[in-house]
């Protein structure tokens, strides 16, 4: 009951009306001051930082250029199927005599199924025209088709298929380049964040140490404390100031190191704007979860380096089909339907076709096929080599992911211990401060406890930084830093 009465006596009395008005003014001014300081500081979040890199960084642009070049190569490969218009003119005159006068115009279309369609007109006259040519005007429509080698695939179709594959492969190469770039940028970003957080942490403790020094100076002037106590307090201020200056230097150098990732649209680098600060909140929200098995599964399906080799395998599969076709003899059919007076074709009944056509058949076959067999064997060896590389790379990636998982588990345990140490050192400091008020301790012990507490805070920050770096290295190893 006595405690309750004493507690009620400590209840603050209502402020006079004038004091209330002054207090409102102070609060309004304080809010304005805080809002101005907050607006002066610009928080650079990690996602925004990476977006800046993806837009203007030279490596990001180089990666996009590779994609654009592959797209241009694919577009050029389509050119083998462009219709081709040709014209040939040959004329010979001597002593006023026309020996021959040839004018041939032809339109030829290569199709993706291996069939070549053509149509043209010929005009031939002269005293010594070739017997193979039809005197006068001639129109024709014809087809050319391979029946063995080149029926399923030929060089032009293989190039087109491989160009489409290389275009997709360039996208994986871009992801791989950005994955490596993002890792370096993320590591430097969190280093900057940790340094800034250390600086913020130490400035708070520096303020506490200065307040303690001011109180001891007043107590010394009143004769309640000795000169040695003020000297102890001043030494503690100096100690924390040294730590703060070191953290400030690290924060500034870390901020400068981020400039190597910051480029504008004019390909000019720039430094962070004054007042830009990192996302300290995100640094404090360290996610403690084991994603090792999930990331291994993702890496096997989505890792850009493995994707590059898989597309190489697809391109080699096209090459294998082409080389297998080279083992077959060359056999081509040619057929033209003819008509005098250009395109004055009659109805396509049997007598007309039997009497107005031109037919050809080409056949060629090397007797030993050594070149074709050697090329085919080389392609099979390339496929075997690429399969071995994929298996080895997959195992390397899996081991990297697991090793970073082991590292994170160890850091997790250390973080838990560190959090407990912070609480314990804080309690020891509070107990020592209470004992000092009772005259049972010294300022030297207070400083010692405070130094240990600060040391535990900085150690905790260091462990958080190591954990974040390890977590993002694991994402990098899985190839999923870039979506």
Model-derived features: where do they sit?
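Bacterial Sec-pathway N-terminal export signals of envelope proteins
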Residues: 40-98, 148, 152-158, 162-164, ...
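Amphipathic alpha-helical coiled-coil segments
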Residues: 50, 62-77, 177, 181-202, ...
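Periplasmic alpha-helical coiled-coil/stalk elements that build and connect Gram-negative outer-membrane
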Residues: 165, 171-295, 407, 452-453, ...
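Membrane-embedded alpha-helical bundles of multi-pass transporters/translocases
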Residues: 76, 81, 87-88, 108-111, ...
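Sec/SRP-type N-terminal targeting helices
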Residues: 61-65, 78, 114-136, 147-173, ...
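Terminal intrinsically disordered/low-complexity segments used for targeting and assembly
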Residues: 1-3, 14-57, 61-64, 68, ...
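Small/polar, glycine/serine/threonine/aspartate-rich low-complexity segments that form flexible
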Residues: 86-145, 277-288, 320-321, 325, ...
């Amino acid at each position: 009951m006595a405690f309750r009465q004493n507690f009620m006596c400590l209840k603050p009395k209502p402020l006079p009306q004038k004091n209330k008005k002054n207090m409102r003014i102070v609060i309004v001014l304080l809010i304005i001051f805080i809002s101005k300081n907050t607006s002066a500081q610009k928080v650079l979040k990690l996602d925004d930082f990476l977006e800046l890199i993806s837009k203007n960084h030279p490596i990001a642009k180089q990666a996009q250029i590779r994609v654009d070049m592959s797209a241009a190569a694919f577009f050029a490969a389509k050119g083998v199927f462009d219709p081709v218009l040709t014209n040939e003119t040959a004329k010979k005159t001597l002593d006023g005599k026309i020996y021959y006068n040839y004018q041939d115009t032809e339109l030829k279309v290569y199709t993706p199924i291996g069939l070549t369609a053509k149509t043209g007109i010929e005009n031939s006259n002269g005293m010594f025209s070739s017997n193979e040519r039809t005197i006068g005007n001639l129109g024709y429509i014809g087809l050319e088709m391979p029946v063995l080698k080149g029926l399923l695939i030929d060089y032009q179709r293989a190039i087109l298929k491989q160009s489409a594959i290389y275009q997709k492969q360039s996208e994986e190469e871009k992801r791989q380049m950005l994955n490596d770039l993002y890792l370096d940028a993320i590591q430097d970003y969190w280093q900057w964040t940790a340094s800034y957080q250390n600086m913020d942490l130490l400035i708070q403790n520096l303020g506490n140490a200065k307040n303690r020094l001011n109180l001891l100076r007043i107590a010394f002037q009143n004769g309640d404390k000795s000169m040695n106590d003020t000297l102890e307090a001043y030494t503690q201020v100096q100690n924390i100031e040294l730590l703060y200056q070191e953290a400030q230097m690290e924060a500034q150098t870390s901020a400068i190191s981020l400039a190597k990732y910051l480029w504008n649209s004019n390909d000019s680098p720039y430094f962070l704007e004054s007042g830009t600060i990192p996302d300290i909140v995100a640094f404090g929200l360290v996610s403690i979860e084991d994603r090792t098995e999930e990331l291994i599964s993702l890496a096997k399906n989505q890792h850009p380096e493995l994707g590059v080799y898989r597309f190489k395998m697809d391109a080699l599969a096209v090459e294998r089909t082409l080389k297998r076709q080279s083992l077959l003899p060359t056999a081509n059919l040619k057929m033209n339907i003819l008509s005098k007076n250009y395109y004055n074709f009659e109805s396509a009944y049997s007598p007309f076709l039997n009497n107005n056509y031109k037919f050809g058949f080409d056949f060629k076959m090397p007797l030993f096929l050594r070149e074709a067999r050697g090329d085919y064997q080389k392609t099979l060896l390339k496929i075997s080599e690429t399969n071995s590389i994929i298996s080895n790379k997959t195992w390397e990636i899996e081991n990297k992911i697991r090793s970073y998982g082991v590292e994170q588990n160890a850091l997790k345990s250390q973080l838990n211990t560190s959090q407990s140490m912070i609480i314990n050192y804080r309690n020891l400091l509070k107990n020592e401060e209470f004992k000092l008020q009772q005259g049972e301790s010294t300022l030297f012990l207070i400083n010692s406890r405070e130094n240990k507490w600060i040391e535990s805070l900085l150690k905790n920050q260091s462990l958080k930084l190591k954990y974040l770096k390890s977590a993002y290295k694991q994402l990098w190893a899985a190839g999923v830093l870039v979506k």
